[in-house]
Each structure stands twice: as structure tokens, then as C-alpha cells.
Amino acid sequence: MEEFKRYLELDRSQQHDFVYPLIFQEYIYALAHDHGLTRSIFLENIGYDNKFSLLIVKHLIIQMYQQNHFLFSANDSNQNPFFGHNTNLYSQMILEGFVAVVEIPFSLFSLEGKEIVKSQNLRSIHSIFPFLEDKFSHLNYVLDILIPHSIHLEISVQTLRYWVKDASSLYLLRFFLHMYWNWNSLITPKKSSFYFSKRNQRLFLFLYNFHICEYESIFVFLRKQSSHLRSISSGTFLERRYFYGKIEHFLEVFTKDFQVILWLFKDPFIHYVRYQGKYILASKGTSLLMNKWKSYLVNFWQCYFYMWSQPGRIHINQLSKHSPDFLGYLSSVRLNPSMVRSQMLENSFLIGNAIKRFDTIVPIIPMIGSLSKAKFCNVLGHPISKPVWADLSNSDIIDRFGRIYRNLSHYHSGSSKKTSLYRIKYILRLSCARTLARKHKSTVRAFLKRLGSELLEEFFMGEEQVFSLTFPSSTSQGLYRRRIWYLDIVCINDLASHE
């Protein structure tokens, strides 16, 4: 970042106008690709130690604009992912360098702005589980909402114009955006069919977080009492860049327009949580209040941000009757009845008391579906072998299966009931045994009889054993009876991931 500042050497009012020239700087591509400055393919002459590649980058950008990328189909994208075999790698690097460049104005302002530290409501993803346990037992309703997206790519460019006023950079951004004919890839980059979608998730994260930053700067202002929890998909771009600056601007410009609906936000018990492309509003209010929130949110997105939001994307759930799905947990609030005997002089009587309890359950059906998709079992949950791992050594096979189970057990350690985890352990253990038997061209029974069932026990360490290693043995039994949240694992996206 100091390199960026030394290069720009501009007033804050002029920094926006000089983003595009950075695309022609050699160190931009070194930072984007983690390459050395003297070994990049963008150097015009070998051994020439300058940091400009103006002619090469300019020539490639002209070539990109001249190509008719609408002629390529989804089937051609694998063989010709960009615009031809000659410019494939160069175009890829220009796109990644452009993403690094367009983040610079936001990064510079984030370093200069220090008011953001004052907020006590901006929290990380690790706060979600303690938040659920502490707050949900006192709440009644939850609005489960899918974050809407723009109905046209140009809306995203126009929104970005207010922060990056460099026309050339916006033209280049518009060009890259129109290469993605599947707009859903912006919200869920894993579903994109383009070759560079997996290699350029930084672009998706930047646009997505900027999209979130815009609406939260107004929405979170209206709910100062909310528990704002940051998204998992924060990537390299901090979401809350201009939170306090935009609040002051909002007070001056929009306060009068919202006087009619400000009464809606007087509920002191409403909480805001965002995660994985969704957000929830949890309240202690009534069903009528939540329906008013639902109606307002639809108009809020469509009128002020031109985002397509349907009422069907917002679900009102009563916590006592419905179990919302939060980051792999089914969360619910249950009444735990209890009877207390009271005695006064010679008379005794029973007092009924119902205590709300927050329960978290591992959803076994989605878990089995994920294991089935990763080829560890069939759709009914019957374990099968993993043929693609059969060529590995015994220790590697066991280590991969064991790592998956330990991660799942670690992540779901806060569950109120461990029955689902025992079934997952059974599926993975038997799948591991069948994979080893397939490798040695034997049956599972014969293989375990020859090597012993203790071979798998070492790698499928139970959660109690892991917990006993974390706390002293004298206190582990007492603490283990309570729900424990491990906050060192943020999320598990792919069960078969071992890289």
C-alpha cells in the first residue's frame, strides 16, 4: 500500500481520477500473481529493469475489445476460455491486475478513516454462534431473507461510479462484467461456467462486498441497535469502508424522506445477522411487526437500489415452531417445562415453570446429501468406496477420511445432540474401510481381520478425546457437559477438499 501512495502522490480529491494508469505498472501484476518483479512475462525486454509495460498491456487491451466474445459458447469456454490461445494467459493476468487496481481507492480510504473502530456492533463471523445462544432464547420471530441482486449489470457499474470516477476503469470493468452472461455467478461464483471464475473470485468478492456495503450503509444506520455480523465472503476487501461517512451524509439528505417509516425501527430487540448471501432479522415483536418489516424491505431494495426483491424471498418464521438453518445448524427455541415444589407452613403445592432453551441440531439429511455428492455414500446414506483415492497409500487414505471427520466433528461440536455426528462417523469409517479393501482387492471383513480394526481408531479420534487434550483432565468432564463452540474453523465448503 505504501507503494501505491508513493506512486499516486495526489490529494484525496484527485485519487479517484488516476486509477487506470496503475494497470500499466509492473508491480501491480507482481502483487496480483505473487511473482518477482524481474521475472514477469510483461517485461518488454529481458533484463530491462523498468516497471512499465505500456505497449504490451495497451496492445492486449485493444485486442480484447476487438474480439467478439459473444461468438463463444459455454462448450467453447473450456478450450478457448478467453479470446484465443495466444492471449489467454495475458488476458487472465490483466483481469486479475485490474481487480487489484480497482480496490486501491477503497483500501487507501480505509487506512485513513479511523472512525470505523468506534463501532461496537460490527462483529466477525465468530460471533454468530454465541449470539444465537445468548439472544435467540429471548426472541419470537425471524425474517429469513435472501440478499437480492441487480436485474442488470449496468446497475453495478453505475453504483461504483460514485466511488471510482475514472471513466477508463469503469469501461474496462463493464467489459469484463459483460463477459459473464450468468449474473448468478456474481452472488455464487462457484456456479459460474467461465474458466476464470474460480481463479478470479477476488473480483466477485469485491463486487459482492461493495454491493453489500452500499445497502448496509443506510440499512444499518436505521438499525443502530442491530448485531451486525460480517459475511464469510469478506475476502481481501473490507466491507465497512465508509460506514460513518455515509451515515453523516444520510442524515443530511435522506432524514426527511424517512420520517414516515422511522417509527418502524423503534423495536429495541431486533437484531441483524448476515451470512453466506443471506441475512436475518430476529425480533421479540409480534407477527404484525414482522409483516411490516417484510413489506418495507421489498420496497427498500426496489425503490432505493433497483434490486429485484420478491416477497417470496422473505420468510417469516416463529422460533417456537420453526428451526432456521444457520451455517450448518438447525436452530430452534424449545420450551423446557419443569415443576417446582413449594411448601409454606403445612401446605405444599407445585409450581409449573417453562424455560426457553436454545437447541442446535446437525441436519442429518443435508449432511448425507453432501456426503453422497462427494461419493462417500449413496443417497440413502449407505457407505461406498472412494475409487479416486484407491491409488493412494494406506496412510494417505486414512488421513484424508480422518481429517474430514475431525473437521466436521470440530465444527459441529456446539450441537445439542451428537447422534447425527455418530452416523457421519459410521459412514466415513466404513467408506474408508471399503476404499482400503478396494485398493488391496479384498473384502472389508478380510482386510480388517488382517490389519486389525485399531488401524482406523487412531485417525477417527472421538470428540471427547480431542476435548480432553484441550482442557485439563480434572475439569474436562464438567465442561464437556456444556455446549462448546470452536471458533477456529469458519466454514467447511467441500467435504472432499484436502488441499
From Swiss-Prot:
GO biological process terms held by the UniProt record: mRNA processing; RNA splicing; tRNA processing
UniProt family annotation: Belongs to the intron maturase 2 family. MatK subfamily.
InterPro entries, alphabetized: Domain_X, Maturase_MatK, Maturase_MatK_N
Subcellular location: Plastid, Chloroplast
Organism: Camellia sinensis (Tea plant)
GO MF annotation terms: RNA binding
Keywords from the UniProt entry: Chloroplast, mRNA processing, Plastid, RNA-binding, tRNA processing
Pfam families: Intron_maturas2 (PF01348), MatK_N (PF01824)
Annotated protein name in UniProt: Maturase K
An annotated GO cellular component: chloroplast
Keyword Membrane: no
Record has Secreted as a keyword: no
Protein's job: Usually encoded in the trnK tRNA gene intron. Probably assists in splicing its own and other chloroplast group II introns.
